[in-house]
């Protein structure tokens, strides 16, 4: 397998980063040694996260991993619109001067927020410096004492962080996208809380439009029907994280909620800017009451400097492109490429045997022809012990993907995540399919050969590098 020097050097840097450090720190201060012991827990399973630069950024690998979903960063389209926006406001200030409630508010940010709210069918919009900050703000500011939160088990980590600090007295998880489990969670929560039964407190339902690790879509319409049935007094509110729907789902990227016409049914939406929009920040959508609660009770807003003019201008530039339909062709190409990938790999000669043996599996490809739309997130499953081998195989083939392992997903649920972008090509997808099939063929040969302890060539190469740099 011919990997170029940049790919190998990045792998060597990663290997070195996974070496245990604490055992070599016997004479170091206790404070730092204890921290390294915590980091060594990650290193011991090769799961320590580092700042390593992905090889797709240097042009040494195909990008099947980044969040630049509409390829606005790749094409320079966003940069051009951003510079045009700056030119329209040549006297802008670089500094907001404070938090939104402590001298940092200004006309431009309010105007952009209202434009976004109008475009997405909301009464108000409020900007945050990141999606995580927005999520944490929602769950620390909105739930009242006595409220309950019922949440999908796969909601974002930042949602869990916010819930942990919330005033809600009850938090109940339900099995991912399982309507029966959701009904049971809603019923049991309602039955065990008199203040929910009498309508004086509310159940907040936390979901994502598109799930970041599984790539599937929330059954939002059906969940709302169940909530109305379980809560006849109407004391429930849905909170939808649209991080992976913003820009790529619905006409002009309006997201799942607006696509389904549920703007008035979902109380709060979080639309992030760091994925399809190729910038940073997030916007929380809701009515004036929700906005005022956030302005008064969200510490991550009250105590944080407001986004600067350039930060807001690039968000406006992205929404300008969406609103005018300039990103629709990119959206359509994502749909085409994902379906092309599904068709290509499921029709390959090795597919049936590989899936029967558990060597390759793509759950989101099942019945994809019947779906209204597919998502850009394509998790590739293999046997758990093969997950890193699959990653090594793709990495050395100059395909940049992300191995997803614990703690990002539950133990036993590891997978390799492929992200398909508007800027990818059919030829790149063909190469991805061929490389996955090569891996499947090699693993089948190993299993059928019966040679104990034999490992695939890519893993041999990586393990040799590990030994050389031990």
Curated annotation (Swiss-Prot):
GO molecular function, one term: transaminase activity
N6-(pyridoxal phosphate)lysine carried by residues: 275
EC top class, as a word: transferase
Subunit (UniProt): Homodimer.
Protein name (Swiss-Prot/TrEMBL): Aminoacyl transferase sphA
Membrane-spanning ranges: none
Sorted UniProt keywords: Aminotransferase, Pyridoxal phosphate, Transferase
SUPFAM superfamilies, alphabetized: PLP-dependent transferases
InterPro entries attached to this UniProt entry: Aminotransferase_I/II_large, AON_synthase_class-II, PyrdxlP-dep_Trfase, PyrdxlP-dep_Trfase_major, PyrdxlP-dep_Trfase_small
EC number(s) on file: 2.3.1.-
Record organism: Aspergillus fumigatus (strain CBS 144.89 / FGSC A1163 / CEA10) (Neosartorya fumigata)
Residues where pyridoxal 5'-phosphate binds: 212, 244, 272
Induction, as annotated: Expression is positively regulated by the sphingofungins biosynthesis cluster-specific transcription factor sphG.
Biotechnology note: The sphingofungins A, B, C, and D, show a limited antifungal spectrum of activity but are especially effective against Cryptococcus species, fungal pathogens causing opportunistic infections in human.
Knockout or disruption consequences: Completely abolishes the production of sphingofungins.
Keyword match Transferase: yes
Co-factor requirement: pyridoxal 5'-phosphate
Pathway the protein takes part in: Secondary metabolite biosynthesis
């Amino acid at each position: 397998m011919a990997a170029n020097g940049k790919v190998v050097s990045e792998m060597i840097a990663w290997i070195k980063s996974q070496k245990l450090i604490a055992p070599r720190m016997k004479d170091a201060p206790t404070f730092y040694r204890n921290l390294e012991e915590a980091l060594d827990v990650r290193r011991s399973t090769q799961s320590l996260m580092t700042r390593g630069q992905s090889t797709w950024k240097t042009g040494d690998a195909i990008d099947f991993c980044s969040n630049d979903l509409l390829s606005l960063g790749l094409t320079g389209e966003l940069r051009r619109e951003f510079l045009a926006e700056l030119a329209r406001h040549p006297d802008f200030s670089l500094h907001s001067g404070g938090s939104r409630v402590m001298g940092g508010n200004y006309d431009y940010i309010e105007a952009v927020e209202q434009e976004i709210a109008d475009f997405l069918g909301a009464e108000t919009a409020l900007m945050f410096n990141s999606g995580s900050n927005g999520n944490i703000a929602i769950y620390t500011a909105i739930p009242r004492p006595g409220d309950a939160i019922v949440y999908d088990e796969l909601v974002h980590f930042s949602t869990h962080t916010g819930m942990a600090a919330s005033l809600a007295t009850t938090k109940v998880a339900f099995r991912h996208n399982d309507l029966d489990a959701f009904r049971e969670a809603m019923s049991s929560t309602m039955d065990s809380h008199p203040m929910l039964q009498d309508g004086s407190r509310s159940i907040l339902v936390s979901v994502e439009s598109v799930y970041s690790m599984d790539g599937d879509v929330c059954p939002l319409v059906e969940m709302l029907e169940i909530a109305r049935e379980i809560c006849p007094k109407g004391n429930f509110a849905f909170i939808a994280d649209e991080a992976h729907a913003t820009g790529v789902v619905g006409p002009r990227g309006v997201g799942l909620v607006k696509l389904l016409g549920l703007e008035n049914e979902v109380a709060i939406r979080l639309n992030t800017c760091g994925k399809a929009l190729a910038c940073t920040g997030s916007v929380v959508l809701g009515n004036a009451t929700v906005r005022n609660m956030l302005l008064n009770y969200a510490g991550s807003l009250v105590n944080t400097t407001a986004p600067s003019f350039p930060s807001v201008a690039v968000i406006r530039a992205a929404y300008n492109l969406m609103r005018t339909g300039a990103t629709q062709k990119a959206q359509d190409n994502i749909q085409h490429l994902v379906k092309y990938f599904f068709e290509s790999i499921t029709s390959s000669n090795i597919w049936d045997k590989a899936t029967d043996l558990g060597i390759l599996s793509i759950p989101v490809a099942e019945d994809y022809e019947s779906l209204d739309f597919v998502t850009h997130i394509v998790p590739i499953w293999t046997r758990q012990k093969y997950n890193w081998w699959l990653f090594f195989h793709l990495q050395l083939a100059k395909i940049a993907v992300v191995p997803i392992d614990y703690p990002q997903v539950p133990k036993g649920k590891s997978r390799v995540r492929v992200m398909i972008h508007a800027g990818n090509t059919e030829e790149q997808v063909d190469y991805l399919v061929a490389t996955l099939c090569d891996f499947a063929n090699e693993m089948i040969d190993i299993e059928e050969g019966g040679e104990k302890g034999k490992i695939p060539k890519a893993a041999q190469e990586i393990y040799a590098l590990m030994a050389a740099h031990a």
